[in-house]
């Protein structure tokens, strides 16, 4: 390992002041000269650090409500000077600039301000200028300067100081993290700015981007010959930061299915369980409690549920845990677990138990294509047609409240099924799912086949319109009680006619929920 770079002088300017007591102790113990700014200097001084204010170095006061603090040649020359070069050392001497060996800086909470609903001016004020400049300068000059951007690095700083400083390899790792930090920050600003009124074009952002920091490598990807890893985005921890309570390490496919399952379960306000396999529902159900919801979801297709992923929108109860313990399950993900539930589930050595709060779905979804990205607003049931009060009765008589509730359930559950999607439901539970077929009539046949005798009296939802009347006829022949679909086909009159003739109520939503 390369020779260590001693740390004799540090520049510290942080917004997030957590861990400053730990940082202060490390700097004091190593007798590091500290230069700092404003409130950071005061906080460090309160922990016993002898601090030199930046304004004493620059001869220029902080100004413009703190907008200008460190943007000065005597600061940046001290960060950027490559002391391996004689000419740089000579210029530092001539300019009376002392170099920095360490820069500790984290940035204004821009993304957090946006997430909290800050107005335009508040968000603008939280765009950091001096901080990213210092961080990038130190990262560029990592041959001479170490840079820290997160309080979680302070403990390792104490270790490095005790060993005589960071090695070149360690400084390079710190620099990479620093550049990732500023890159994510800039992407957040550009994405927000690109969606503002007067900047967006026809309501579409002029810039979209996403960043990810390596969380951990995975054993392999979708298949064993593909490398894979999990990357965490800034903000809410989400599934990528879920707490694993038990079981083997998550696989790539586990993550994909778990992500689909969580979204399906949290599409409902009532206690809900979604059982997912290959990103498609084996069953989705609501119940009076989470154990009942699980029984109903599992009953939809107990054969396919073998080796599936289970997601809940409520903590897993002991009763539900006892039920799941009898089934081979890859993953259970929930916002929590009642006392005793984890112990029951842990009887199965390999089952993966994750604790994760409700998903925070981004306003826009991105999908990579050759040469670019596709971006669209996330489907959050925000359309008028997702409210049954706005549905149009196209055929038959109005249904009673119980049947309407089942139609509403089926409509929401159907969104989680890969297109072409048909979902049959009864009593707040799916009883037959037809997914992923390239024609809609085959999806109808598959849903009816999966439901068996349960098809009679159930209701049906279709994620898109019926192009022909053959699909509805399959459902009618299975004695479906009512159908809900978007409508909009040039042959809607044929679908309306077969439903009218059979006396089957048909509702049009005017909204589609394709899912590819």
Curated annotation (Swiss-Prot):
Disulfide bond annotation, renumbered to this chain: none
Record field: catalytic activity: (6R)-10-formyltetrahydrofolate + 5-amino-1-(5-phospho-beta-D-ribosyl)imidazole-4-carboxamide = 5-formamido-1-(5-phospho-D-ribosyl)imidazole-4-carboxamide + (6S)-5,6,7,8-tetrahydrofolate; IMP + H2O = 5-formamido-1-(5-phospho-D-ribosyl)imidazole-4-carboxamide
UniProt keyword Repressor present: no
Domain MGS-like residue range list: 1-149
Identification of the protein by name: Bifunctional purine biosynthesis protein PurH
Pathway note: Purine metabolism; IMP biosynthesis via de novo pathway; 5-formamido-1-(5-phospho-D-ribosyl)imidazole-4-carboxamide from 5-amino-1-(5-phospho-D-ribosyl)imidazole-4-carboxamide (10-formyl THF route): step 1/1; Purine metabolism; IMP biosynthesis via de novo pathway; IMP from 5-formamido-1-(5-phospho-D-ribosyl)imidazole-4-carboxamide: step 1/1
Family named by the database record: Belongs to the PurH family.
GO biological process: 'de novo' IMP biosynthetic process
EC number: 2.1.2.3, 3.5.4.10
Annotated keywords: Hydrolase, Multifunctional enzyme, Purine biosynthesis, Transferase
Domain notes: The IMP cyclohydrolase activity resides in the N-terminal region.
SUPFAM superfamilies registered for this protein in UniProt: Cytidine deaminase-like (SSF53927), Methylglyoxal synthase-like (SSF52335)
Transferase as UniProt keyword: yes
One function term, GO molecular function aspect: phosphoribosylaminoimidazolecarboxamide formyltransferase activity
InterPro entries associated with the record: AICAR_Tfase_dup_dom_sf, Cytidine_deaminase-like, MGS-like_dom, MGS-like_dom_sf, PurH-like
PANTHER family the UniProt entry points to: BIFUNCTIONAL PURINE BIOSYNTHESIS PROTEIN ATIC, BIFUNCTIONAL PURINE BIOSYNTHESIS PROTEIN PURH
PROSITE patterns per record: MGS
Entry GO CC: cytosol
């Amino acid at each position: 390992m390369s020779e260590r770079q001693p740390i004799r002088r540090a520049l510290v300017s942080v917004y997030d002041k957590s861990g400053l007591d730990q940082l202060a102790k490390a700097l004091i113990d190593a007798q590091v000269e500290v230069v700092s700014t404003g409130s950071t200097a005061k906080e460090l001084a309160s922990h016993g650090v002898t601090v030199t204010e930046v304004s004493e170095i620059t001869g220029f006061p902080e100004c413009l409500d703190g907008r200008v603090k460190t943007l000065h040649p005597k600061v940046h020359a001290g960060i950027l000077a490559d002391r391996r070069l004689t000419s740089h050392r000579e210029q530092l001497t001539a300019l009376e600039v002392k170099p920095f060996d360490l820069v500790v800086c984290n940035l204004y909470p821009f993304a957090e301000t946006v997430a909290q609903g800050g107005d335009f001016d508040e968000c603008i004020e939280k765009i950091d200028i001096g901080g990213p400049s210092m961080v990038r300068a130190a990262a560029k000059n990592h041959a001479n300067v170490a840079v820290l951007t997160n309080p979680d690095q302070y403990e390792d700083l104490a270790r490095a100081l005790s060993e005589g400083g960071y090695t070149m390899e360690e400084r390079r790792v710190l620099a990479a993290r620093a550049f990732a930090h500023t890159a994510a920050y800039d992407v957040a600003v550009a994405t927000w700015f690109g969606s503002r009124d007067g900047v967006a074009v026809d309501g579409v952002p002029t810039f979209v981007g996403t960043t990810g920091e390596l969380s951990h490598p995975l054993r392999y990807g979708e298949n064993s010959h593909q490398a894979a890893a999990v990357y965490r985005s800034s903000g809410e921890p989400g599934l990528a930061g879920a707490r694993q309570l038990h079981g083997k390490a998550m696989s790539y496919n586990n993550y994909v299915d778990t992500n689909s399952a969580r979204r399906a379960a949290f599409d409902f306000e009532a206690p809900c369980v979604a059982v997912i396999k290959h990103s498609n529902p084996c069953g989705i159900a609501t119940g009076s409690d989470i154990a009942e919801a699980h029984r109903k979801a599992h009953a939809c297709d107990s054969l396919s549920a073998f080796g599936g992923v289970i997601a809940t929108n409520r903590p897993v109860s002991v009763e539900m845990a006892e039920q799941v313990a009898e089934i081979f399950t890859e993953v259970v993900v929930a916002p929590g677990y009642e006392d005793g539930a984890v112990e029951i589930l842990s009887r199965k050595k390999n089952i993966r138990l994750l604790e994760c709060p409700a998903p925070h779905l981004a306003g826009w979804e991105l999908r990579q294509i050759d040469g670019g990205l596709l971006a669209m607003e996330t489907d959050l049931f925000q359309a008028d047609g997702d409210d049954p009060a706005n549905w149009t009765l196209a055929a038959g008589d109005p249904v009673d409240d119980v049947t309407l509730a089942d139609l509403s359930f089926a409509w929401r559950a159907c969104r989680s099924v890969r297109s072409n999607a048909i979902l049959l439901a009864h009593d707040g539970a799916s009883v037959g799912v037809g997914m992923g077929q390239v024609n809609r009539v085959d999806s109808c046949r598959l849903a009816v086949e999966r439901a068996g005798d349960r098809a009679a009296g159930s209701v049906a939802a279709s994620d898109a319109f019926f192009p022909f009347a053959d699909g509805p006829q399959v459902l009618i022949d299975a004695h479906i009680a009512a159908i809900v679909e978007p409508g909009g086909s040039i042959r809607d009159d044929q679908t309306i006619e077969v439903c009218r003739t059979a006396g089957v109520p048909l509702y049009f939503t005017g909204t589609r929920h394709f899912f590819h």
